[in-house]
Amino acid sequence: MSIHQSSDLGALPSRISDVVVPWVERSPDRPALIEASGAWTYRQLASAISETQTWLSRLGVRPGDRVMIVGENSRAFVALLLATASLDAWPVLVNARLSARELDEIRTHCGARRIFYTTSISTQAAEHAKRHGAAIEEREGCGSVGIGALNEEAVPEPLDANIADRVAALIYTSGTTGLPKGVMLTHTNLLFMAAGSVKVRTVIPDDRIYAILPMSHAVGLSVVLLASLIAGASLYLSSSFDPMSARVILERDRLTLLFGTPAIFNQLLQYAKMRKISSLKFPALRVITSSGAPLDLATKSAVEALFGMVLHNGYGLTECAPTIALTRPEAPRSDISIGPAFPGVEIQLLGSDRQPVPAGEVGELQVRGPNIMKGYYRAPEETAAVIDAEGWFNTRDLARLEDGNLFIVGRTKDLIVRRGFNVYPAEVEAVLNGHPAVVRSAVVGRTVGGDEEVVAFVQLSAEVTSTPTELADYAARSLTSYKRPSEILIVPAMPTTAAGKIAKAELKKVAESSIKEGTNGQLARRILPRQEATVEN
């Protein structure tokens, strides 16, 4: 099964930094970026980009250099990002909440010329800056910015003759299955995605968009930041997410678009439940969208009841800049489909024989279009393993297509084969998440005696209690025998990556250890100590 969504996006600028130019000419005094410490109009944003570009040049940044920007959502982060791109250097976008080990691995791999840290807005960025011995400088409108030492050994990458095909951002994947890979996204990749997002959601200059998804990740970069700037809208920056603050900001500033993850929406649900709030309705809010992780029906239904509006669903990967499919505002859905393919993107589903599967059957999802990455940095073999000679990118995700709408079934690597039958973790998770005591769950496979078992990890609500036995009985009412968990482990909080995704590789290790030590949940509590179950921005 193969399908192609047409795209008529018109001319795009050459560089991501050029998106502000039309609005400086049309509406220079329109608010562009707003944060707690102040705001920039489009005129001020353009000036900040120009001044930062000059500053970076003085600090030895050259075209083709990799420039690490360690930070969180802020005017400083945006200015550094767009100024670096305008110099034809590569912005290496790094979430400040990464560990020291993760950050240092990226620094070594990319061979950064310099590292900059948004120290005013981010405690974690300030800690990294101190650890690296960075100098601190005050920048107007940006607060304090850490400046790492110049790497004299850094060698610039050659520039592509076509500006639009040059690397506009280097984003390292969260690495839930191993070492992170550097995804090279071009100006075309990001601008195609941003412009298409504007068109699909009909974003206009009067929109006020809540930027809580980290701009160091693909969704926050293209779908939130660049799409907002292309549309001439106003972006309200938040470096972290707190349900109480979010409620105040959504109401006070009359925000119109909210992009979140299932974890963020679950926090809002828990906030409402703890305060016995049955309705969170904001008159100005017109679109709410979930992406970044699978959305289960229980969460979708609860959020829609709370907000009094449809929760849209999207799906993508960093390598695809990132959106592959999304539900449309004009065609709301009551299920958990991720909707049709993004405009201008081709999709096809292949079976194990690498041939297209019939409509309605599960296949491995392949994607082709202007959103597909240039490749993995310094990893040509890994790039060739996922992008074929015809430009098809293998997502390694399993999906089915019904009436032009995609449903993600699970990841190829996560597929559990039990008694010869396929078990898709997402299906089991959806059932468990329907229990009133469950905040979220994660299902992994465990090899035992030549077969695989289904192991479920469950995070419970602070208000409602349950037991593994009760949850097993609940799941048994909706799942056939081979899909039922062999073991259910209750955890204080799910381990997550810096992108807020559940770290299933870590859970799989716990599942294997659990059977070796013959425990019944205590091991999970010991290995996975309580942590804040929040999306790390």
What residue ranges belong to the model's regions?
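Conserved AMP-binding A3 loop
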Residues: 41-43, 168-195
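AMP-binding/adenylate-forming catalytic domain of the ANL superfamily
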Residues: 480-502, 521-536
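Gly/Ser/Thr-rich phosphate-binding loop
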Residues: 252-260, 270-333, 346
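Conserved pre-ATP/AMP-binding loop-to-beta segment of ANL
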Residues: 13-14, 28-29, 154-172, 179, ...
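AMP-binding/adenylate-forming catalytic core of the ANL superfamily
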Residues: 98, 117, 369, 374-375, ...
